[in-house]
């Protein structure tokens, strides 16, 4: 979820700062509303220090960060963080990054970042000890079943697998059975498999057959062998649409975490709107990023 914007300057003047602007928005939009429920979750703007840095594969960086003081607030699976890019005057807008994992024992927040634009490439240069100003937790996350024993299929592709790790952990702690179905072009694209294994069974597809079954996630044999109580997915839109269509065909409720381009992260700039089935447009950053797919216009 990256969004680049041209930098506006006036000769002889300082670069306009959006920090005060975003702080004001934070106060105005702390109440997050969704169609069926209203969730009050306090938002924070604070510096987090990088405690560990890992490179899961070329072009990706895993930052494990912790508050300089205090403890991490409650964070729901599927929510995201807006990071201020340091020392990068051409990227004054924050970058939205999905929450990969929350380790409350170590007081760490994990963010898996794909370095594809100026902002994320700068973030990929961060080192242990660096501090990043973060606004979090933002958006609405995945639905946790109200009763235990539910079997939930978590389908991810590419960097879209990132939020499913924390969701899987949360499901397991809630007494549910998470089952992971992860897809990539090659086996190299599949990251954090050892972490996923701690929380549930893993099934894999690759387009070149280098790992798991060959093909797309919707071609995997597990979909015909087992029944699931619900499905949650995150990844490239074509993949999520295919998963949503499969779920609809077998009568299983499905949620998707959208990765629309975002800027403010609070529903003010309207650059991340998504058309709903009823014709209305909703801000992905505020009303989502997780939506029940039967509310989206995908299946029309």
Describe the function of each predicted region.
Residues 118-263:
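FNR/FR-type flavoprotein reductase catalytic core
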Residues 237, 259-289:
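Local cysteine-cluster metal-coordination motifs and their immediate loop/turn environment
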Residues 42-128:
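Ferredoxin-reductase
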Residues 86-88, 137, 277:
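Short, surface-exposed secondary-structure boundary micro-motifs
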